[in-house]
Every structure is written in C-alpha cells, then in structure tokens.
C-alpha cells in the first residue's frame, strides 16, 4: 500500500465502521500484513486465509508470518480469494499497482460480479 492508502485504511478501520469486530485477509506479505497490523492495533479479531499454488512444485514465497486469531486451512489462491469475498460483508481493495491483474484485482472483480459491497482505494 502507498502512504495515502495506509492513512485512509487506518482511518476507515478506526472510525468508519463502529460495529466492526473482525477482519479477513489473505495472509501475504505487504498489504495483507499491514492490514493485519492495523487491525491488531485496533483490537479487531483477525482471520487469516493463507493461499497456496495449485502446482505442488511451486513454493509460496510471499506468505506473511502473522499471529491471527483464526487461521483457516490453505486453499489455492483463486479459491481462497473467493472464500474471503464470500465471507465478508464489505470488501476493501487497496491495489499497489495500476494494473488490473493479480490476486487483489481477482478478488475485487469477483466481489463486484457477485454484488458484494466493495470499496476500491487506489
């Protein structure tokens, strides 16, 4: 996440949803990790959904080492992304690139297609 996204997200988590109790993320380094840390500071319950490759020969290198309140079993990335979207009431996406490809975009686009309330913050 860029600094503007971080500032915005922390404010939204802290003040935007007073009834917010739990958050879900994909357990990757970078944005998921930062999101998890914000949620932890705000004493929100954290749910981690680690992803794995469908190819057993591929090692996942971008998994964050996080102590979530709830950690779900690994699922292939695209399946995991849909699970995260299906599980939440609101999906917040903060892509780090202007490209419309990758896991963040896959999850965001799935949420849009399925009518999930979503926010995209560039």
Regions found by a protein language model. Give the residues of each.
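Acidic/glycine-enriched connector segments
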Residues: 1-122
């Amino acid at each position: 996440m860029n600094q503007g996204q971080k500032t915005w997200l922390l404010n939204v988590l802290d003040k935007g949803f007073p009834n917010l109790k739990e958050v879900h993320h994909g357990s990757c380094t970078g944005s998921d990790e930062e999101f998890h840390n914000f949620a932890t500071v705000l004493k929100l319950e954290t749910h981690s959904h680690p992803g794995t490759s469908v190819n057993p020969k591929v090692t996942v290198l971008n998994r964050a080492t996080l102590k979530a309140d709830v950690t779900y079993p690994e699922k292939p990335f695209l399946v995991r992304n849909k699970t995260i979207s299906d599980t939440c009431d609101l999906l917040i996406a903060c892509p780090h690139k202007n490209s419309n490809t990758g896991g963040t975009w896959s999850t965001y686009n799935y949420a849009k297609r399925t009518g999930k309330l979503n926010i995209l913050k560039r």
